[in-house]
UniProtKB/Swiss-Prot annotation:
This is Malate dehydrogenase. GO terms for molecular function: L-malate dehydrogenase (NAD+) activity. Its EC number is 1.1.1.37. Catalyzes the reversible oxidation of malate to oxaloacetate. Keywords: NAD, Oxidoreductase, Tricarboxylic acid cycle. PANTHER family: MALATE DEHYDROGENASE (PTHR23382).
Length: 327
């Protein structure tokens, strides 16, 4: 059997991690024939609850779980890891603006970016903790790990969009392909129904209802997180954990011919995105943890206008944290 895959998970005592860790430990991501070692990171005051999470993982007696350890120091947690799932971030409190959240979380991702220098040479970092695009940018700019090893999660938005399109068309989710969420994981994201396909046909041909696509589908995807909070009194956890697994799976599995997946990556000029910004893009992978941007996706003036607006939002976020970006 191959060596175990070493995976660090930050925010490991939180709700997303609670849904994520059991599936990760049970072999649902890397397979039943590959053992995993989990290195769980939390803040010192959460080490008690994290001990309980560790006990539960141990009590599952998964054959695929080789080891589980708890840390409150990122350098120790990231030592020798192959994957880093950066789930932890300070949540938005009452009366907090997004700008407040960005400034509070920035220093956390500076430290974690530097700590990633202790990881294995093939490490990949996936940022889930919000605001994930800008947190990912901060971590990448503060690490010696190549920038193409970093990505931020847009997969929950992609999955939400796929479900809504399939439901409206009376199709199966598996029939929906090429869903792109352009830009930022915020309520200004751009769920692109024009490039998406259902059963191999462009969505506007299958769902010939422009008013629904523009005025119902897009806002529903953009505001789904808030709707979940309103309904259950807590933010998305199980669906976010599932999306994180889907995100990694798309990086370790060759992309099916003719399809794409979506994640936020350092675009460096593609589609006019400023160098250094982390933006949602259409991607493919060879299945070796890599990604390539799919160039040449057409944008109507409607989609392009919204994309330009969300790029401005990402630029404003970068300006807020410019003192945390070396060079």
């Amino acid at each position: 059997m191959a060596d175990p895959i070493r995976v660090a998970v930050t925010g490991a005592a939180g709700q997303i991690a609670y849904s994520l860790l059991v599936r990760l430990a049970s072999g649902q991501l890397f397979g039943k024939d590959r053992k995993v070692e989990l290195k769980l990171l939390e803040i010192p005051q959460a080490m008690g609850p994290l001990e309980g999470v560790m006990m539960e993982l141990q009590d599952c007696a998964f054959p695929t779980l080789a080891k589980v350890e708890a840390f409150d120091n990122p350098e120790q947690a990231f030592d020798g890891i192959n994957w880093c799932l950066m789930v932890g971030s300070r949540p938005r409190g009452p009366g907090m603006e997004r700008s407040d959240l960005i400034k509070i979380n920035g220093p956390i991702f500076v430290n974690q970016g530097k700590a990633l220098n202790r990881a294995a040479q093939d490490v990949r970092a996936v940022v889930v903790g919000n605001p994930c695009n800008t947190n990912c940018m901060i971590a990448a700019h503060n690490s010696d790990v190549p920038h193409e090893r970093f990505s931020a999660m847009m997969r929950l938005d992609q999955n939400r969009a796929k479900y809504l399109l399939a439901s409206k068309a009376g199709a199966q989710v598996i029939d929906v392909t090429n869903v792109v969420i352009w830009g930022n994981h915020s309520n200004n994201q751009v769920p692109d129904f024009e490039f998406a396909k259902i059963g191999g046909k462009p969505v506007p041909e299958v769902i010939a209802d422009a008013a629904w696509l523009e005025n119902a589908f897009m806002p529903t995807v953009q505001n789904r997180g808030a709707a979940v909070i309103k309904a259950r009194g807590a933010s998305s956890a199980a669906s976010a954990a599932n999306a994180a697994l889907d995100h990694v799976r798309s990086l370790i599995t060759p992309t099916p011919a003719g399809d794409t997946f979506c994640a936020a990556v350092m675009a460096n000029g593609a589609y006019g995105v400023d160098a250094g910004l982390i933006a949602g893009m259409p991607l493919t992978s060879t299945g070796h943890g890599d990604w390539s941007i799919v160039e040449g996706v057409p944008m109507s003036p409607f989609i392009k206008g919204k994309f330009d607006a969300v790029l401005d939002e990402l630029r404003r976020e970068r300006e807020m944290v410019k003192d945390l970006l070396p060079g």
